[in-house]
Amino acid sequence: MSAYLLTAPAKINLYLEILGDRPDGFHELVMVMQTIGLYDRIEVRQNRSGDINLYCQHPEVPLTASNIAYRAAQLMMTRFADIYARVGGGVDITIEKNIPVAAGLAGGSTDGAAVLVGLNLLWDLGLTQPELQTLAAELGSDVPFCIGGGTVIATGRGEILDPLPDLDGIPIVLAKYSNIAVSTPWAYQTYRAQFGEHYLQDAASWRTRMTQIHAGGLIKAIQQKNIQAIAHELHNDLEKVVLPEFPQVQQLRDCFTKHGAIGTMMSGSGPSVFALCETLAQAQALKVQVAQELNDPALDLWVTHIASPGIQADFR
């Protein structure tokens, strides 16, 4: 039966600032989000059973409706029930999991985005990227970004996207302790408890701050593709609560700096940390140096690069 194979990239945050509390209970955010060259692969295949069947060999990936990929299929089947009924059958979703789980890299969100793109193609729905991103926002704050990828300034909950010039090819080293997981709700709730008194209190103040960030140093550095300046402007509010709670993450960050990373930061709610490098050779050397110094079997390291594409699909 017909199938599509999709590549679904991880993301890092080059910037994350929490502005305040929204009426819907979420935080108002300003982020610069960036896809990287570390991918999950997802096969979306029509079946005759009428069911959603989710397959993945990774022991930490749930095969139930708690998985965003599963919920993405449910959403498409519900929203396009007439087309689903005409097509007949269900869908088999097979995930090859290469992106670390619970790592602040949008691994679950990008899989959900891939299922949306795959079913759009499989059922010949003809949805545009903005239409897919509107659906994606119902699944999670990072999912709309994962559809298109690239370099983007994201506001609201993260679903309002404004493209920036691509930064293709900048080498990075990515690192995560496999024995550390950070709960995203915990990170944001702890930040609120510790720093909520400093939140901006109204939408007008949020807009003013967003304008300042749009005109600020990081955006200018991205427009100029100035790696040194980008590294200088990296910022993540959630480091204020995660690093004190997880000293190994702080140690990892410090180790990257010690061995010459141009810039280093935790991505999202962590615990993944990335380091920007000038050249691939520097990135490869940095990976070896950090692995040797920390000498921890639970520490996983990857050499990869900044990459612009979001979800990519091939017919099988």
Swiss-Prot record:
Keyword Acyltransferase: no
Keyword Transferase: yes
Catalytic center residues: 11, 142
Record-linked SUPFAM superfamilies: GHMP Kinase, C-terminal domain, Ribosomal protein S5 domain 2-like
Pfam family, one: GHMP_kinases_C
UniProt superkingdom: Bacteria
Alphabetically ordered keywords of this record: ATP-binding, Isoprene biosynthesis, Kinase, Nucleotide-binding, Transferase
Binding site for ATP: 100-110
GO molecular function: 4-(cytidine 5'-diphospho)-2-C-methyl-D-erythritol kinase activity; ATP binding
EC category: transferase
GO biological process terms on file: isopentenyl diphosphate biosynthetic process, methylerythritol 4-phosphate pathway; terpenoid biosynthetic process
Catalytic activity: 4-CDP-2-C-methyl-D-erythritol + ATP = 4-CDP-2-C-methyl-D-erythritol 2-phosphate + ADP + H(+)
Pathway listed: Isoprenoid biosynthesis; isopentenyl diphosphate biosynthesis via DXP pathway; isopentenyl diphosphate from 1-deoxy-D-xylulose 5-phosphate: step 3/6
EC annotation from Swiss-Prot or TrEMBL: 2.7.1.148
NCBIfam families according to UniProt: ispE (TIGR00154)
Function: Catalyzes the phosphorylation of the position 2 hydroxy group of 4-diphosphocytidyl-2C-methyl-D-erythritol.
Entry similarity comment: Belongs to the GHMP kinase family. IspE subfamily.
Protein name in the entry: 4-diphosphocytidyl-2-C-methyl-D-erythritol kinase
Organism field: Picosynechococcus sp. (strain ATCC 27264 / PCC 7002 / PR-6)
